[in-house]
């Protein structure tokens, strides 16, 4: 079975590699020549534990090759970004462009799958696009939607062991897609239709966003009330039917921080809680920036000089290199406005360089700083001792037992 993956990013590349490692002949397509060249050397351009070793293995076996154009295959998977516009409207132009790129290669009996997170009805729209361009394929190819649901940092395991939701435009398409995924997925494959499968992914991430918003709102309340929010949540979770999540500096990434807008854009009146959760989580990042700026002003008043400030973490969540929609990056940018860049030590242990921020080793930054703002709870930070001689702003629970 020949399979063509369009998009070799944080999801497309691991999925292509895992599929290849399970005996599927894979062509991976990406418009970035550097990405293609890197993969063909058995290397990867992202950070994901264990993935580079697996990539090297499948490249060495000849079951995975990367290129910039599609190849004739039996299965085509669309795994490209679906961002939103400035007014939070979903942008499916990448999905459409990827679909157009494979239309010339499609033949009767082929399977076309979208994995990209998409607004409800996207798969049907792409089916109509295919039929318009290639009318002879109507009722002669299989079309389905199957959203990814993996955790960065544990992608290889979850690609294989997580359940998957698979929805075809008809029953035959669903069965065809189930047969494909059964070749490398050990989790249960749940059958449905395309619209339900599309909504399922949006629902999963919107649910997480709402729950995180509750925790973040609690952190704001506790700050004003003089309560340790970490202790509060630990105690509240002793109730057998309560499971409050942990607050942080906001919500980022290309899933939880984005997917709720796909619902609120199409169903604005019906999604009040979802919309408000987005506002709360966005506000939390603004609040963290304000708190840090207040600490800087207070230090200047008391000490008569500008402090050295360490901003700990830029990624959107712990222990990854992904900065997409990162609240930490927003906070760092906002806090540094109007100040001398030399007074700030920016830390992100999962990347070697950044085009905007000059990076500093986390131990050096912690030692030199007067004010330390923990924006992301990277595991490296757990080894740092509490220092009474520093102003510590712990927005993500690095020192959960301290009342900070």
Where are the model-predicted features located?
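Structural/interface elements that position substrates and couple domains in central-metabolism enzymes
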Residues: 1-404
